[in-house]
């Protein structure tokens, strides 16, 4: 089997003796990004000298419109965060211009150090108990019909933040009874049972948790996470709330092979996952995991065809696809087929 170092040549194990700066002490509320964020991960990242040139099929419109500014102002007004901004999503302009956003709850500081992600790492502040109400007010102000709620990882919380998700769902439904809610949850490491018990009592309309990459690359891309744990989380939720569609996604371009992607897709179906997203990984900075390949649109289309053959109710597969991209359309198609 190909080693992580062979598949991802810009990564070196931590036993490498090359001198590097001492990791910065993490203080509560201080956000670490870039080199400081990834200083303690198991596999060292050598900063990329130059970001790779994107192919012609990856072109993103600059997000400039009155609607983009309006939504940003509304988020600041209610002390909210959008994953669109925090994770530097390439679809920010399209989604904001269309009057939609994916909300990120429980702060903007994550307890994990995933080197593909542009969200900052650190010791989070205590939960904002007013956030569920503020989120509900913002969604009502925007008159949204479909909302995606995600979060940073909160390994500091006994339930991983599951109760906060439930509180947000209740507040939103109280002010916007017709809204459909998709939650994109963390893996609830070490807290699966308690988190799922809470979630099952106040379930979303779609339950989403991303596998992100193939198991061979987990040590490099998802330190602190476990591939089989994530699959079990999705399957156990489905067993508890069988009428709610489950969803997961992968980034392509981290060093995986097409065969590995197909194998993960099969494992997803074995764990009763209904919906799939596949998108191109784009390196946020020179201190993040390097892009190993740009997957051609034809290959994304082939993955979609294979996914439907496997029985997925909906497959969104393309270079700029992200978990919440056109999530309302995905959910509509999936529920029609359930």
Swiss-Prot record:
One of its GO terms (molecular function) is 4 iron, 4 sulfur cluster binding. Keywords: 4Fe-4S, Cytoplasm, Iron, Iron-sulfur, Metal-binding, S-adenosyl-L-methionine, Transferase. Residues 1-22 are annotated as: Disordered. Its cofactor is [4Fe-4S] cluster. Residues 96-313 form the Radical SAM core domain. It is an enzyme of class 2 (transferase). This is Lipoyl synthase. The gene is lipA.
């Amino acid at each position: 089997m190909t080693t992580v170092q062979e598949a991802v040549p810009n990564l070196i194990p931590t036993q490498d003796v090359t001198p590097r700066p001492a990791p910065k002490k993490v203080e509560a509320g201080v956000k670490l990004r870039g080199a400081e964020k990834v200083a303690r991960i198991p596999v060292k990242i050598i900063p990329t000298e130059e970001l790779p040139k994107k192919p012609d099929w990856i072109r993103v419109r600059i997000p400039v419109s009155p609607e983009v500014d309006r939504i940003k102002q509304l988020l600041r007004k209610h002390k909210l965060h959008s994953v669109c901004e925090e994770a530097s999503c390439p679809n920010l302009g399209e989604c904001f211009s269309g009057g939609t956003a994916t909300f990120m709850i429980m702060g903007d500081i994550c307890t994990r150090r995933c080197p593909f992600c542009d969200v900052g790492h650190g010791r989070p502040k205590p939960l904002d108990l007013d956030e569920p109400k503020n989120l509900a007010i913002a969604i009502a102000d925007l008159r949204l019909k479909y909302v995606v709620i995600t979060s940073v990882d909160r390994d500091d919380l006994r339930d991983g933040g599951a109760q906060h998700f439930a509180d947000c769902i209740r507040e939103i439904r109280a002010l916007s009874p017709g809204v459909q809610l998709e939650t994109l949850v963390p893996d609830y490491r070490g807290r699966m049972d308690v988190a799922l018990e809470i979630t099952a009592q106040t379930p979303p309309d779609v339950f989403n948790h991303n596998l992100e990459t193939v198991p061979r690359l987990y040590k490099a891309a998802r330190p602190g996470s476990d591939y089989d744990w994530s699959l079990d989380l999705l399957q156990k939720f489905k067993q508890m709330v069988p009428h709610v569609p489950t969803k997961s996604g992968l980034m392509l371009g981290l060093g995986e092979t097409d065969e590995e992607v197909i194998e993960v897709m099969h494992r997803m179906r074995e764990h009763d996952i209904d919906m799939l997203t596949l998108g191109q990984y784009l390196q946020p900075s020179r201190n993040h995991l390097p892009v190993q390949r740009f997957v051609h649109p034809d290959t994304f289309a082939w993955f979609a065809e294979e996914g439907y053959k496997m029985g997925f109710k909906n497959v969104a597969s393309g270079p700029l696809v992200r978990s919440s991209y056109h999530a309302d359309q995905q959910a509509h198609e999936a529920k029609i087929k359930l």
